[in-house]
Amino acid sequence: MLPTILRLPAVKSESGLSRSTVYLRISQGLWTKPISLGARAVGWPSSEVVAINAARIAGKPDKEIRALVLKLETARKSAA
């Protein structure tokens, strides 16, 4: 299955978060950093959005979500 990249409107729809909350969570280490799609476009791998949403739904504390985000970003780097 090919990885899907979600742009911000899709991320907002999938997560129920606003743009400012997505970027706040990135700064807090509670959301993965976006990947560059071009000079003025970014997106997030759909698998990362699904994993973070699942952790939130499961009631994981922020500490565990930060660890998940770190794991996801590390896996992203090693997949290249």
Question: PLM features: what roles do these ranges have?
Answer:
Residues P45:
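PIN/NYN-family metal-dependent endoribonuclease catalytic core
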Residues V50-A79:
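A short, Lys/Arg-enriched interface patch at domain edges and termini
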Residues L2, A79-A80:
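Short hydrophobic/aromatic patches at helix-to-coil boundaries
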Residues M1-Q28, A51-A58:
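Polyanion-binding surface elements
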Residues I35-A41:
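Short Lys/Arg-enriched helix C-cap and helix-to-coil transition segments
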Residues T4-L6, S15, I35, R66, ...:
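Intrinsic-disorder/low-complexity peptide segments enriched for small residues
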Residues Q28-I35, P61:
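Short, solvent-exposed alpha-helical "recognition" segments
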